[in-house]
């Protein structure tokens, strides 16, 4: 017979949510940094053809 699981505590829920949000923050920061370096021409990982 199926037994319902115990409730996740509020503190555990907040910790998991914070970890999830922090991952998104760092990903967006890296993407912004890469876009900034591409726009200024200082990128070392991408080669962008310049249009004259």
From Swiss-Prot:
Molecular function as annotated in GO: structural constituent of ribosome
Family from the record: Belongs to the bacterial ribosomal protein bL32 family.
A cellular component annotation (GO) from this entry: large ribosomal subunit
Compartments, as annotated in UniProt: Plastid, Chloroplast
GO biological process: translation
Pfam family, one: Ribosomal_L32p
Alphabetized PANTHER family for the sequence: 50S RIBOSOMAL PROTEIN L32, CHLOROPLASTIC, LARGE RIBOSOMAL SUBUNIT PROTEIN BL32C
Record InterPro entries: Ribosomal_bL32, Ribosomal_bL32_plant/cyanobact, Ribosomal_zn-bd
Superkingdom of origin: Eukaryota
Assigned keywords, A-Z: Chloroplast, Plastid, Ribonucleoprotein, Ribosomal protein
Name the record gives this protein: Large ribosomal subunit protein bL32c
Chain's gene name: rpl32
């Amino acid at each position: 017979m199926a037994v319902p699981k115990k409730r996740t505590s509020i503190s555990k829920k907040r910790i998991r949510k914070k970890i999830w949000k922090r991952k998104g923050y760092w990903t967006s920061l890296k993407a912004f940094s890469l876009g900034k370096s591409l726009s200024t021409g200082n990128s070392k990982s991408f080669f962008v053809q310049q249009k004259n």
